[in-house]
From Swiss-Prot:
Gene3D superfamilies: Adenylosuccinate Synthetase, subunit A, domain 1, Adenylosuccinate Synthetase, subunit A, domain 2, Adenylosuccinate Synthetase, subunit A, domain 3. Pfam families: Adenylsucc_synt. The active site is at D13 (proton acceptor), H41 (proton donor). It is an enzyme of class 6 (ligase). Belongs to the adenylosuccinate synthetase family. It comes from Desulforudis audaxviator (strain MP104C). Plays an important role in the de novo pathway of purine nucleotide biosynthesis. Catalyzes the first committed step in the biosynthesis of AMP from IMP. Binds 1 Mg(2+) ion per subunit. This is Adenylosuccinate synthetase. Substrate binds at T298, T299, T300, G301, R302, P303, R304. SMART domains: Adenylsucc_synt.
């Protein structure tokens, strides 16, 4: 038995969905532990592309069990559409269970998110996905949220109407926005509750029993380390904990259950939305990375900001997640660039710093200190083992691992399952 946590080691969009799908072959359970439909995971199976936002990426393995944990915020309408999309594709699917403790995104959460992002004077305007994620988490921690189990309780209709009416009054006072109709929204969510009912379980108990029975469990994070509410580039962050610690809190298991933590990083760096980005490239190289890597958000379609690989970031991710391995994706995107750069440190006010700063003013003033390595011209998409990679590509990966202080565990050279080069056996470490 092994339990493996897969986390993003950058600003999200690192390719966790592809790797979750790949690693799910050896897992018995695939568990999503935080975030909502602000995350986008693209999985390619036999040439068919699936874009998922809520459902764990292991859903396309019919012999597995997929779990949406208590740390996730759920938009029932989005979940329903994803299930319908998967069923329409005609592929057999894994069993799916949803935590009864997971919180629910309401229409007023989405409305509030949009209003804050559209208000020029808003202090909360940070470039969100406008999906209501932040307001839903805010209500959770203010103890004003609604859990999945609350929608299934007797008296749910009256409680829904009361909360919707109160939230509508607040939206009207602060934003002068039209209030949602309590009758209509309450009925809509009661209908959603019936759709959810067959999937709802005490998933903490389900995962605990799987671990006790010696089954392999894969915990799938959304977003990335630098979007973590506590350890990310605050306030340009998400509203949950994508870091490895979030796997325990977001699923209801103890931290000592976790055996292995894998940090996923692209062979370069990307970011969506606002905030400092020391290695950002605003030139032809940045455009090349965006075009070759198809760097557009799965959820929003926004173009991603692109830059050179930053090992100040990967070292930081290694520290806050206790990374055992690195998984490097999109190595093939670097093909054709004559010279590659890796950021090994920052220079701030004349001195070199090697640790990621918490102050945004410092991060914004940092200049990257680069090492240069030779590129390669060979097409990597047909490579099927690490040894087949060009010498320059292997040297680049080795230096990435050395500067990060974490060994390589897997390398990806394309979106397909078969374009994955394993270097470690994650589920048989004990």
């Amino acid at each position: 038995m092994s339990t493996v946590v897969l986390v993003g080691a950058q600003w999200g969009d690192e390719g966790k969905g592809k790797l979750t799908d790949y690693l799910a072959r050896e897992a018995d359970l695939v568990v999503r532990y935080q975030g909502g439909n602000n995350a986008g995971h693209t999985v390619v199976v036999e040439g068919q592309e699936f874009k998922l936002h809520l459902i764990p990426s292991g859903i396309l393995h019919p012999d597995k069990v997929c779990v949406i944990g208590n740390g996730v915020v759920i938009d029932p309408g989005v979940l329903h559409r994803e299930l319908e999309m998967l069923r329409a594709a005609g592929r057999p699917l894994a069993a799916l269970y949803i935590s009864e403790r997971a919180h629910v995104i309401m229409p007023y959460h989405r409305q509030c998110d949009e209003l804050e992002e559209d208000c020029p004077e808003s202090l909360r305007r940070i470039g969100t996905t406008r999906r209501g994620i932040g307001p839903a988490y805010a209500d959770k921690y203010a103890r004003e949220g609604l859990r999945v189990v609350d929608l299934l309780e007797a008296g749910a209709e009256e409680r829904l109407k009361l909360i919707i009416r109160r939230k509508g009054e607040i939206l009207g006072r602060i934003h002068r926005a039209p209030a949602p109709d309590p009758e209509r929204v309450a009925q809509e969510y009661l209908d959603h509750a019936e759709m959810l009912r067959p999937f709802v379980r005490d998933t903490s108990l389900l995962v605990h029993e799987a671990v006790r029975a010696g089954r392999n469990v894969l915990f799938e994070g959304a977003q990335g380390t630098l979007l973590d509410i506590d350890h990310g580039t605050y306030p340009y962050v998400t509203s949950s904990n994508p870091t490895a610690g979030g796997a325990a809190v977001g699923t209801g298991i103890g931290p000592r259950v976790i055996d292995t933590v894998i940090g996923v990083t692209k062979a370069y760096t990307t970011r969506v939305g606002d905030g400092p980005f020391p290695t950002e490239l605003k030139d032809e190289t940045g455009e090349h990375l965006r075009a070759a890597g198809r760097e557009y958000g799965t959820t929003t379609g926004r173009p991603r900001r692109c830059g050179w690989l930053d090992t100040v970031i990967t070292r930081y991710a290694a520290r806050v997640n206790s990374l055992d391995y690195l998984a490097v994706t999109k190595l093939d995107v670097l093909t054709g660039l004559p010279v590659l750069r890796i950021c090994r440190a920052y220079r701030y006010q004349g001195r070199e710093i090697h640790d990621f700063p918490s102050r945004l003013s410092v991060l914004a003033g940092c200049e990257p200190v680069y090492e240069e390595l030779p590129g390669w011209t060979e097409d990597l998409t047909g490579v099927r083992s690490f040894e087949e990679l060009p010498a320059a590509a292997r040297a680049y990966l080795d230096r990435l691992a050395e500067l990060s202080g974490v060994p390589l565990g897997v390398v990806s050279v394309g979106p397909g399952r078969e374009q994955t080069l394993p270097l470690a056996d994650f589920f048989h470490r004990r």
